[in-house]
């Protein structure tokens, strides 16, 4: 019976979409002569004009809007089927679900989803008892936005602040925000154009962030930002010039070091800084070499390295 229902919905949608498509002419991208120069030889690309890294060209945007309008017009007949399938998929998901708590410092941390809400709620509770505290309700943060995601968050060593990275465009270009967990209010500190990793120094005032190139979107710089200072004056502590390497920052499991992680297909590299000395320089743990990959953890005052050598 269910299969028959879907077949009827699909047949109706197909006939309707054909009728709709006949009423609307598909946009046609014009061809403009253009030669792409390359060390491996030149080639012709008549659609090169559609490339706009700034995403601001009125001509390109107008064409893309017409493409989207045509696609939406064509697909609108399938909306009943889309709604039916979406409802069935949602019906198979446990909506009131929580993660297993983990303990760090004086608190247990966990994530919860609530029925009818699309986004997670991040919470904590003191290990010695007390009331549950909402750190971030992503449902509230997402209100009024067509897209919203929190990629990463980290609580400060003094347990009073939470730094989080949000994206409201879908381009994975994140903005740093910092919330005071005592008041529930966000601080004025904001940095944009970031990747999805962050780390704290032990002073609970210094943050490490990865800046993306605004054109290529590749991670290129590690910035050190001190809370309360102008984000424009964030200190550059490392810059990667090899675009084959991905970059991230984090803390060791014992929180004694801040780490810059660098990785490519065939090699890795780690640079470390004493988390209690944010004014010190990052030190190279082991230099990158082709066909050499490693990871390291800091345990009881020494580094333990695992490698594929």
Predicted regions and their residues:
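Bacterial N-terminal signal peptides that target proteins for export
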Residues: 1-8
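Beta-propeller folds
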Residues: 8-13, 19-309
């Amino acid at each position: 019976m269910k299969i028959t229902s879907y077949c009827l919905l699909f047949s109706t949608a197909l006939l309707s979409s054909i009728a709709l498509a006949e009423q609307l002419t598909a946009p046609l991208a014009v061809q403009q002569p253009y030669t792409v120069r390359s060390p491996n030889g030149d080639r012709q690309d008549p659609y090169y004009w559609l490339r706009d890294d700034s995403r601001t060209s009125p001509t390109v945007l107008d064409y893309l809007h017409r493409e989207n309008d045509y696609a939406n017009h064509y697909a609108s007949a399938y909306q009943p089927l889309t709604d039916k399938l979406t409802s069935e998929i949602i019906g198979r998901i446990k909506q009131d679900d929580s993660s297993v708590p983990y303990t760090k410092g004086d608190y247990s941390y966990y994530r919860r989803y609530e029925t009818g809400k699309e986004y997670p709620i991040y919470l904590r509770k003191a290990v010695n008892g007390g009331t549950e505290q909402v750190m971030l309700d992503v449902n509230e943060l997402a209100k009024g936005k067509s897209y919203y995601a929190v990629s990463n968050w980290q609580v400060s060593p003094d347990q009073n602040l939470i730094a989080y990275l949000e994206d409201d465009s879908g381009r994975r270009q994140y903005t740093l925000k910092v919330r005071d967990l005592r008041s529930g209010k966000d601080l004025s500190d904001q940095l944009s154009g970031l990747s999805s990793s962050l780390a704290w120094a032990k002073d609970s005032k210094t943050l490490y962030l990865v800046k993306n190139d605004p054109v290529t979107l590749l991670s290129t710089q590690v910035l050190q930002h001190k809370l309360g200072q102008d984000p424009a004056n964030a200190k550059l502590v490392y810059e990667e010039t090899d675009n084959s390497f991905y970059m991230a920052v984090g803390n060791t499991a014992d929180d004694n070091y801040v780490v810059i992680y660098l990785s490519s297909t065939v090699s890795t590299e780690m640079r470390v800084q004493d988390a209690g000395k944010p004014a010190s320089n990052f030190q190279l743990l082991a230099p990158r070499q082709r066909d050499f990959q490693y990871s390291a953890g800091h345990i009881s005052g020494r580094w333990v390295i695992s490698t594929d050598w």
